Amino acid sequence: MEEVAGMQPDIICLPELFDTMFVQEQKPLSEVAEDEKVPGIVTSRIAAFAKKNNCYIVCPLVTKKDGSFYNSCLLVDRKGTIAGVYHKKHPVKTEIFPDQAFKGGGVIPGAIDQPIIETDFGKVGMLICYDANWSEAWDNLKKKGAKIVFFPSAFPGGRMLNYYALKNNYYIVSSTGGDARVIDISGNDLDSTSNFVRYAWAAINLEKVNVTTWPTNGMLPDLFKKYGDRLGIKVWGNTEVITIESRDPQLKVLDVLKEFRIPTYEELLKNETEVQNKYRPESGKK
């Protein structure tokens, strides 16, 4: 974290169980877990760093609450306070069974419906590792309005993360013990780690949306003519998706779409689904 502090990040995401990975098999769960309400050794240091560097930190570790243990993510805000907690919904069974992944106990699954968290730059969600295999978990974060999903993990997640980013029109930031990525809403990597750099970093624009090439492609000349470089427009031919972003703080991308009557990717699919359902044989429509 000290290496990236000079970049003045708004938020840093650490890997799953970054403080105890492999240690939890030697030390009792009760010793490595930290209370969610009372700052422990790790959370105190993370909080101090966040406050000093004016940034948020996604801090994944084992927590204890009301006598139970969870594989968790704490979101520490710029003031060094805990802004929210996420409990891993789908832990591997070896995490649950006592004395397998964790010495002297096991964690329990988090609630299926958990709130997303408000930050000063937008709503964020969190999922952890094995959660990646349940697509409804990703869809639910979209329904709740998440703009960025943080994914601390023990495995990379691969192409499924790129798909979820495109499908749900949000950014995904993954962080593992082996690699890290920042994935654009188009489903393409903005940055990733390498053999030479151990962290991924990217500036992201939340004034950015996905639309489909049809019917938008016919409107591109007029968009360029009116707004020029105030808009960033990228056509992704292989998925027939166009990303449109505002490069002007005074220009809201949704206002531009409304002006040109361009539906977002989600709006188009919603409308198409409504028409399809209306005319299905079981709907009674003749």
Segments from the language model and where they lie:
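Cys-nucleophile CN-hydrolase/nitrilase-fold catalytic domain and related Cys-dependent amidase chemistry
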Residues: 2-79, 156, 167
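Ligand-binding pocket scaffold of soluble enzyme catalytic domains
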Residues: 4, 9, 83-87, 117-120, ...
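Active-site-proximal beta-strand/loop segments in catalytic clefts of secreted hydrolases
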Residues: 15-17, 60-62, 89, 128-130, ...
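CN hydrolase (nitrilase-like) catalytic-core segments centered on the catalytic cysteine
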Residues: 35-56, 123, 132-236, 245
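Alpha-helix-centered segments that form part of catalytic cores
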Residues: 39, 51-52, 107-115, 126, ...
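Short beta-strand scaffold segments in enzyme catalytic cores
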Residues: 60-61, 72-75, 115-117, 180-183, ...
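Active-site catalytic loop in hydrolytic enzyme cores
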Residues: 65-144, 159, 163, 167
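A short C-terminal boundary segment appended to hydrolase-like catalytic domains
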Residues: 209-286
